[in-house]
Amino acid sequence: MVVRRRKKSRHLRGRTRTMGWGRIGQHRGSGSRGGFGAAGMHKHMWTWVVKYAPTWFGKHGFNRPQIYELKASEINVGELAEKLDAWLREGVAKQEEGKIVVNLAELGYAKLLGRGKITRPVKVIVPAATERAVKKIEEAGGEVVILKQQG
């Protein structure tokens, strides 16, 4: 068993052959510290592992495959109102008959949710929308066109 003790003093008292390390081999290699690196973690350094690195061994959790991670496919009415100007500049939304027309399905959104406020008349084309979202859009003078899902 390795004896845990402080390293010897670095004060060299006189120029000697071994500088306070006894026989020549005693300061050579890695025997005095119990091995290089992580050697002995499951053996003679186990008490160190238990105290300072309890999660050193074993598997912890998992990485979910990205194919199953759902992308953010909902948008709130408030977010929609904030993004309208940028979408008009980019050409994603159009101005028709005094209303801004936005196709959320083409932008990758699957559902319109009712959180937030909207004051401008908007025609929104979307696969699904909540009752509250439809009510808020209609109160602002707009309309919601819900696409029929295939299948």
Curated annotation (Swiss-Prot):
InterPro entries: Rbsml_uL15_N (IPR027386), Ribosomal_uL15 (IPR030878), Ribosomal_uL15/eL18 (IPR021131), Ribosomal_uL15/eL18_sf (IPR036227), Ribosomal_uL15_CS (IPR001196). GO terms for molecular function: rRNA binding; structural constituent of ribosome. GO terms for cellular component: cytosolic large ribosomal subunit. Keywords: Ribonucleoprotein, Ribosomal protein, RNA-binding, rRNA-binding. GO terms for biological process: translation. Signal peptide: none annotated. PROSITE patterns: RIBOSOMAL_L15. It comes from the Archaea. Transmembrane segments: none annotated. Belongs to the universal ribosomal protein uL15 family. Binds to the 23S rRNA. Part of the 50S ribosomal subunit. This is Large ribosomal subunit protein uL15.
